[in-house]
Regions:
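Charged, low-complexity terminal tails
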Residues: 1-103
Length: 103
């Protein structure tokens, strides 16, 4: 599918007369949105935070689950937030307000 993504981006950029970066960005957002909906439906979780990154040279893409690091006593949305103490177990420099990502 990697090659198809590159062909799609090239065709859309030429057809709409926009830069490939704009098309890549829109495609990343669309894939992230579809992933959020699918996971939320399949797991009955609140909406999660997801980021998709497409390699501009190969067309390969990665999906990352994301959580915002919050104070331990301010952990209201477990599907989108991670408590500072939990984040610190995985990362030495966990700081409130930063984003923790997992592929």
């Amino acid at each position: 599918m990697s090659r198809e993504i590159l062909l799609l981006v090239d065709a859309l950029a030429r057809e709409k007369n926009v830069s490939k970066d704009i098309v890549f960005g829109a495609l990343e957002l669309a894939l992230a949105s579809a992933t959020k909906k699918k996971i939320s439906q399949d797991t009955n979780q609140d909406e999660i935070d997801v980021r998709v990154s497409i390699d501009r040279h190969t067309g390969a893409y990665e999906t990352f689950r994301r959580w915002t690091v919050v104070e331990d006593n301010d952990h209201e949305f477990p599907s989108r937030q991670i408590a500072m103490s939990d984040a610190a177990e995985h990362e030495v420099e966990a700081v409130v307000g930063t984003i923790k990502e997992e592929p």
